[in-house]
Each structure stands twice: as structure tokens, then as C-alpha cells.
Regions:
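Core hydrophobic alpha-helical transmembrane segments of single-pass membrane proteins
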Residues: 13-17
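Bacterial N-terminal signal peptides that target proteins for export
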Residues: 1-11
């Protein structure tokens, strides 16, 4: 019996040590609280420095007023091609934005699967340049648009619309988590 008691005590000690080690390990910190509205978002500070590094984004530039947003250059979403990522915060409902886009010639808008309960639409409207956009519903009076496009004249390779949309699909959950909570 003595051997069995030692074995049980040893297992208990190892389990406790493992639990203590797990408790003291570097767990990721919880995400910062969501802003209550788009007015609280500073567009060029939307991504953390770690995210900018991960997404290979640089040179943030505010959009020209009256537009509220920021533009970054990058190359992660299509190897060897320079791209531009634009975040635009809009004081208008997604429905109104979609209606305006829908009236544009050749508009191709499709609803995507919801991201953490938030409605999202993809804009693949053809134009002179290759681009893909996502429109995020915030509430009945505001929305956000994220657009990824080729940075014209910078590289010899050209991404396809499919390449750019794939990059946005990768970013969508991260962007959703930084927007105000969905309100109905």
C-alpha cells in the first residue's frame, strides 16, 4: 500500500505543479473594450503596432475630409505586389451605403456570412483598378468600410480581385472586434 500512496501523492504533486505553471504562464491579455460609437475611433490608430507588423502595413495617412478614415500601404496580402488598405468610418447606415452602391453601374454587392453576429457585405464592383471591399454594419446610423486594392504603379505583379478578397476575409474578424458592438 505504501507504494501506491507514494504514487498517488506524486501524481497529485505533479498535477499541482502543472496547474501552478499554467497559472503563471503568459496568457494573452483580454482585448481592449469596444468603442461605444465610431466617433471614439481614431482611424490611423485602429491597428496596434503588432498588427501593423503582422499585416506588413506602413505609412498610415488620414483620408481627406470630409471622409473619416485612414489608408495604409502594405504587401502581405499579395506577395511582391504593393497594396493599399483603406478604412472608412461612415455616419450613415450600411443599408444606405448599399443602396448607393447598388445604384452604381455594375455594382456587385453580396452579403457575406456574419462575423461574430455582425452583418457584412462584399463589394466587388468592377472598375479601372483591382479592388475588394467589405462593408460592416454598426447600427442604424453608422457603418465601416474596409477596402483592399492594388497600389498602382508600384510593382510589376498585379493581384487579382480574388487575392484581395481573400486578404480581407482574413482581416474581417480582427476588424469586427475593434468596431462598436452590434446594436439593433
Amino acid at each position: 500500500m505504501r507504494g501506491r500512496e507514494l504514487l498517488v501523492a506524486g501524481i497529485a504533486l505533479m498535477t499541482a505543479c502543472g496547474a501552478l505553471t499554467a497559472c503563471s504562464s503568459d496568457e494573452p491579455s483580454p482585448p481592449p473594450p469596444r468603442p461605444s460609437g465610431i466617433a471614439q475611433i481614431k482611424p490611423c490608430d485602429f491597428f496596434t503596432q503588432d498588427e501593423l507588423d503582422e499585416y506588413e502595413l506602413h505609412d498610415p495617412a488620414p483620408l481627406t475630409p470630409p471622409a473619416v478614415g485612414c489608408m495604409w500601404q502594405g504587401s502581405k496580402f499579395f506577395e511582391d505586389a504593393s497594396t493599399v488598405l483603406v478604412l472608412t468610418l461612415q455616419d450613415r447606415a450600411a443599408d444606405k451605403e448599399l443602396a448607393d452602391l447598388g445604384s452604381a453601374s455594375g455594382a456587385r454587392i453580396s452579403e457575406r456570412p456574419a462575423v461574430d453576429g455582425r452583418r457584412v457585405w462584399r463589394d466587388t464592383t468592377p472598375g479601372k483598378d483591382v479592388k475588394c471591399g467589405l462593408i460592416f454594419e454598426i447600427d442604424g446610423s453608422s457603418s465601416a468600410e474596409l477596402e483592399l486594392s492594388e497600389f498602382l504603379g508600384v510593382s510589376d505583379v498585379e493581384p487579382t480581385q480574388q487575392d484581395l478578397c481573400k486578404g480581407l476575409d482574413e482581416l474581417a474578424p480582427r476588424v469586427e472586434g475593434k468596431l462598436p458592438a452590434v446594436r439593433t
